[in-house]
């Protein structure tokens, strides 16, 4: 036993016990007990201090010094005025922060201040402007299990938006797809349901916020239960219930184009694996308002299935096409984020400059209304209510853009609004002039050149003299404070001026705070009108963004297909084209799909030829069409698609113990179990994750199945199994390929889609240009030649029948013939057929 370390340990715990027994640490521990899952920001003067385990966690994340209080208690601290930066970093690390403020001494003569938690900030409940990105929503999800259904709410507390929906416990893919679209920063579940959700595969690596207060679930409407959970969490985190969420929108099945999580990721709609640039959202986001940017992202993730909505958007665009957009764009740049301003007003987080932003927005909105009325654009804003708000604010607000960030740090109310306020300001200004004058006179009277009159919040106004000259201070100076290098004094005249200044400041603070609160309350009376105004602004910004993309990229207006066919002429990939280097042009391609004879395209061609790009551009054109946008094509006639599936690429899911092939089959199964006749399906290399014959058999069987349907979903099936092109003899299947040009020892990928089938895969050439060593490439070419010649020999020698022709029987004995005649080919899978054929071969070889 190490006696020295034992003694040290005992000494440490003794010191820690003593340190925790102080009045302040007792107060900290009492508050911390009520907020165990948060990092407690404990206000002490101009700092927020963190203690014990909170300090260890925070210091590690924030990279700040960890010290010890009274040699035992771990602690770290941050300046109160720069807390937002630190809070942001803790939120990004998934932490919750409890803000504990100090107010007044607990009792007369006590040095211990009263402290209370005034706000709990969690990743999903942020409304503070400095902690949010203007163009991104910040969602929180609440999940609730009731019988065989999972009800879920998605809410953005910063904008007040709420979305409700439900899924069957057997239909979790839709829940996962919705969560992938919204990307909630925080997911909340009731305590009694935590285990159920934690055991679901998708949530295994997710941290939940457990809602401790169980809501009575007797209500028939489970959405009411979700509403109660949301409001309870608001009360818990905001410490009051002022924050109000808006009327929820129901995410009903069939209203929007359904896309699963793989499709959202594969198409890189709003983000990709590396960044948030080079996505569909990033290349045609020309919005100028925060609301417009958020709305554009929502509409990309939720394309419409209602043609009436699309026609309405097109009608608005047709009006704007006849006008000059520049004045509208200029006006939109003056708009503030009205949704979040209103939320801050409700949550006691408003800033003086929010009123200026509100005024500018209303002023620009009124001008826009006047201009848009001239061209009969339906810009439906509540003009009279907006004018009332504007007049009310203008009567009070200080003119100019130099309003203080925080109330009390500058002029908020205009001169002339309140006589009492003007007098107090004048007294304050005069008092400060008197201070300067007094300093000059005292320097002259005393002859002390180090004399200065200063101010701080703790001591107030004081005369400061260096220690070297302090003994020469006049007798009428009263000592106030001793420092290492100076002495601080006061005098009757200074105290008189100080009272004048402080009384004036107190009057100013009281009047401005009272009027500020009154202005907030008045604005909130018009919340509904302001939110309606915000929606109209967002929609106008969205429409102008689409028109800007049309002009910039040369996109065209698609037409609605009446016969459910998909017809794209010279279509292009919007993102690839927009990000090509100068001088390069995207090679366009055409495609036609219907639900009968041209429903399923088997697409062949070498790697790098452009198969995946071709499929993605079809999907992206379809999405652009269903949000009401223009599309990159020469002409386009597109149907309303209810579900869009992509199976493009796959990787191991190691955490779930799933191989690449298993992931691929899960995605394929999801498509085949959920498609409808109005779906668009894009398969890329199905079956490549297993052996050649297994993979080919699965791909073959899928195509056979899709062909057998009376109404076939529109499908592109990209493959390297050239044998699958033989299936074009089946109904609904046809062949497409990516054209190539062989030139000496080079292969040119022409990127052009043609009707027919590819002759080669050019895999060895791709290996060569990728840098595979020359001896390996050369040997691979030899082996390929050998294998292909043997393949031909086998075909010639064996004359093997296809799966769809009856085999020749002249060399078979009667028993073999009888066995073949008994086969029910229509009930056999390709794998079963190949296995049976292999058995017959073995029998024949034995006979020979």
Curated annotation (Swiss-Prot):
**Signal peptide span:** none
The yes or no answer to whether the keyword Transmembrane helix is present is no
Binding-site residues for ATP, renumbered to this chain: 605-612
Cross-referenced PROSITE patterns: DNA_MISMATCH_REPAIR_2
Q: List cellular component terms (GO).
A: cytosol
Q: Which UniProt keywords apply?
A: ATP-binding, DNA damage, DNA repair, DNA-binding, Nucleotide-binding
Give the Gene Ontology MF terms in alphabetical order: ATP binding; ATP-dependent DNA damage sensor activity; damaged DNA binding; mismatched DNA binding
| One Gene Ontology term from the biological process aspect of the record | mismatch repair
User: Does Ligase count among this protein's keywords?
Assistant: no
Entry's PANTHER family? DNA MISMATCH REPAIR PROTEIN MSH1, MITOCHONDRIAL, DNA MISMATCH REPAIR PROTEIN MUTS FAMILY MEMBER
Which protein family is named in the record? Belongs to the DNA mismatch repair MutS family.
Which NCBIfam families did the record assign?
mutS1 (TIGR01070), PRK05399.1 (NF003810)
The protein's job, in short, is:
This protein is involved in the repair of mismatches in DNA. It is possible that it carries out the mismatch recognition step. This protein has a weak ATPase activity.
Protein name, as recorded = DNA mismatch repair protein MutS
Q: Supply the source organism for this entry.
A: Leptospira interrogans serogroup Icterohaemorrhagiae serovar Lai (strain 56601)
